[in-house]
Amino acid sequence: MRFDVLTLFPEIPEAFFKTSIMAKAVEKGIISCNLVNIRDFAFDKHRSCDDIVYGGGAGMLLLPEPLSLALDSVNASSKRVIYVTPSGKPFNQELAKEFSSEEALVFVCGRYEGIDQRIIDEYVDDEISVGDYVMSSGELAALVIIDAVYRLIDGVISGESLEEESFSGFLLEYPQYTRPRNFKGKEVPEVLLSGHHLNIHKWRLKKRIEKTLKTRPDLIEKARNCGMWTKEAEKILKEFENE
């Protein structure tokens, strides 16, 4: 997969693509990244990319001309273009899976008051929000989405690891433990040391349901509606409800 990131500050995402699992995916050729500095397409000697908002109001807006040229430089018309904005559709694991099936994604990172609506109308396929809060940087929001997407691509992370993570099957992840067995008087649950795979599976499923019920009960209803809720899970849920 190819990621094109259009930004005024390429140094922000640059470090991410050179770090940890992402760096290995790039080295293997599974992922490619192209950081596009919008200022390279500005017209004046100051490389200006923003101006006042028509109709008044605080803040500045990114100019449409440099951004349009930047988008054309990555052949955006033939790719899926994502604009990260607080007013967009909420990002979730389902969208991450959908995006991971694309051959290329283009991210438009806004600053200040955002971007001209005409750019959105002309180029953008998806307006996406990473949460109900406002950030000063579209770059950070774009990296949240990229991180959730690239790890779902074949060859980046093992399938077993992905299957047991939070939101797999709409359940949150179970608690995990490592050495030592006793830490400040707290023991690792005995079942995890037993080597009995079926009992470990049951314990982990129970803990996933317990945590989801406590923290994100809405996900249980989603699992039911999508046909991903098993009889075993329903039995465990009833036990919690009867306690």
From Swiss-Prot:
Annotated signal sequence range: none
GO biological process: tRNA N1-guanine methylation
Binding site for S-adenosyl-L-methionine: 110, 130-135
Main localization category: cytoplasm
Catalysed reaction equations from the record: guanosine(37) in tRNA + S-adenosyl-L-methionine = N(1)-methylguanosine(37) in tRNA + S-adenosyl-L-homocysteine + H(+)
Gene Ontology molecular function: any one: tRNA (guanine(37)-N1)-methyltransferase activity
Location of this chain's protein in the cell: Cytoplasm
Membership in a protein family: Belongs to the RNA methyltransferase TrmD family.
Known role: Specifically methylates guanosine-37 in various tRNAs.
Assembly and interaction partners: Homodimer.
HAMAP family: TrmD
Designated name of the protein: tRNA (guanine-N(1)-)-methyltransferase
Gene this protein is translated from: trmD
